[in-house]
Amino acid sequence: ILAQKGWIAPNWPVEYGGTGWNATQKHIFEEEYQAAQAPRLSPFGLIMVGPVIMAFGTEAQKAEHLPKIISGERFWCQGYSEPGSGSDLASLKTRAVREGDEYVVNGQKIWTSHAHHADWIFALVRTSNEGKKQEGISFLLIDLNTPGIEVRPIISIDGGHYLNEVFFTDVRVPVGNRIGDENKGW
């Protein structure tokens, strides 16, 4: 019901299934939503990758992903952090080498919240080693059901599991899943 009314994404434009509300209307809704103790939804699709796709995605990417994000049909996770990179995201090592109309992705992400539940991951990958480390990074949308992807749990001290490692071994990703220009994902 919330999705049908656009209330799942009150800051999304009406054309993509949101309400088109202004900041005041959105704030009032958020306060009432919290007062009702309604459950929060995962931010990865609605708040993080959805707006990126709206701003920088192709029309085909918008048509493919936005309706499935707002309906809750497609669950996302974020692939940024890597072992050895710490808070220096630009030092990422996961490589995506272009072969024709695909990238071949190899590497690892860590501290990936809810990857074990996600259908897709949006990831920063290194597509070039030339220039400063902030250059040569591209933004890819990757289907987690693609062969070569392994999700391993990171069990917390209390026995909980919401963080994961995600391994990419010769994962083939269509070039059409890149957001924006190659090497301009930073």
Regions found by a protein language model. Name each.
Residues 94-97:
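A structural signal for short hydrophobic beta-strand segments in well-ordered beta-sheet cores
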Residues 84-92:
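Active-site-adjacent elements of ketosynthase-type condensing enzymes
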